[in-house]
Amino acid sequence: MAGSQIKIPLPKPPDSDSQRLNAFPIIMAQEGKGRLLRQIRLRKILSGDPSDQQITFVNTYGFIRATPETSEFISESSPQKVTPVVTACMLSFGAGPVLEDPQHMLKALDQTDIRVRKTASDKEQILFEINRIPNLFRHHQISADHLIQASSDKYVKSPAKLIAGVNYIYCVTFLSVTVCSASLKFRVARPLLAARSRLVRAVQMEVLLRVTCKKDSQMAKSMLNDPEGEGCIASVWFHLCNLCKGRNKLRSYDENYFASKCRKMNLTVSIGDMWGPTILVHAGGHIPTTAKPFFNSRGWVCHPIHQSSPSLAKTLWSSGCEIKAASAILQGSDYASLAKTDDIIYSKIKVDKDAANYKGVSWSPFRKSASMSNL
């Protein structure tokens, strides 16, 4: 079995708004009991290259409700029927051109008609039927998708509450808009992330997030206590890349060798809201040949948290967080090698001071630009 871990400590990067994502505040409509105001939050994450085209990622948070039943006769004075909330939900509208008017975006949500159905294959799934979206988002990715199929545990807070025989509708309440450089839009293909080989060593990334929550809250029971007393600590792992196994028998492939590789890559980590809460990694230096498929031509890669830890991602829908630290871990790629070797840890990963905070929904924007009733 593997022995103890070898760790290379590093001072924590200075605190900054770039290391956090804040939650949407709870704001109730004055004229309606129990109604939340629609809100929008805006943020910019740019690559630093002035020639890089800007795009917007639109991500939505809201609630699934049963579709209201209609009566035989309806008059103009009939009150609008609103069914109780069943559970919370997230759905990404994807990338598209830059959008300018926040107030217009909120008003346009009234034109949205998205139905929700539950199904199953080898596991439970959710099917979003896109009947109508606002014309404002016609150039975003969602406009090309009439049906969106997804794992229920990644996009629905409590999928067990959705039952057969009921028609459901998704009501958008919170709109998260991230203006970013087009070069940031890169994810590694899942088959490449899942592949393991005895010919390479795997480089994993651990990101420690300080989640905003009370010590006695239910979510705190599934996380570590924060020694600084500012919340709770959650660890999330991603497969970052592979490194070719060195065959020079006269060379020692230890923590010094690994630290040299990571130092030359000049890794920086940040957080944003793109496909939901997302970890962004940038390699600003030399990328080894075996690692190049895991980054785009400008050294960027995005890792949506819901792909690695759906439960943590759903926690961040309603809680803000801050990147506390990040480390790269060298392991054997195939399971036989992994079981027989120590983890070598490189903790000198930079945290981008301009993009290391996540402001979730406490249900608080990066910046609250406008709000209106969720009719």
Swiss-Prot record:
It is found in: Virion. Belongs to the morbillivirus/respirovirus/rubulavirus M protein family. One of its GO terms (biological process) is virion assembly. This is Matrix protein. InterPro entries: Matrix_C, Matrix_N, Matrix_Paramyxo_C, Matrix_Paramyxo_N. GO terms for molecular function: structural constituent of virion. The gene is M. It comes from Mumps virus genotype N (strain L-Zagreb vaccine). GO terms for cellular component: virion component. The M protein has a crucial role in virus assembly and interacts with the RNP complex as well as with the viral membrane. Keywords: Viral matrix protein, Virion. Signal peptide: none annotated.
